[in-house]
Amino acid sequence: MAVPFRRTGKTAKRKRRTHYKLSNPALVLCKETNAFTLSHRVTKNSGYYKGKLILENKPSKAQKTTDN
């Protein structure tokens, strides 16, 4: 089994780790609501994707109980 000849120093270890970082999410502006959303996903509030209605908005539970 191979054994390191020398111990890796703090500086070398930290320089190697500087490249592990989070990237900013790709946000796009929704044409219908003017809100930022993740790209390639349907907006939760309006249900639109690429300018087309994909999901119909369902009434919430509170609205269903008050309609009866």
UniProtKB/Swiss-Prot annotation:
Query: Could you give one GO CC term from the UniProt record?
Result: large ribosomal subunit
Which Pfam families does the record match to this protein?
Ribosomal_L32p
Establish whether keyword Nucleotide-binding is in the entry: no
Q: Which domain of life is it from?
A: Bacteria
Any one GO MF term held by the record is:
structural constituent of ribosome
- InterPro entries, per the entry: Ribosomal_bL32, Ribosomal_bL32_bact, Ribosomal_zn-bd
Sequence similarity: Belongs to the bacterial ribosomal protein bL32 family.
Which protein, by its recorded name, is this? Large ribosomal subunit protein bL32
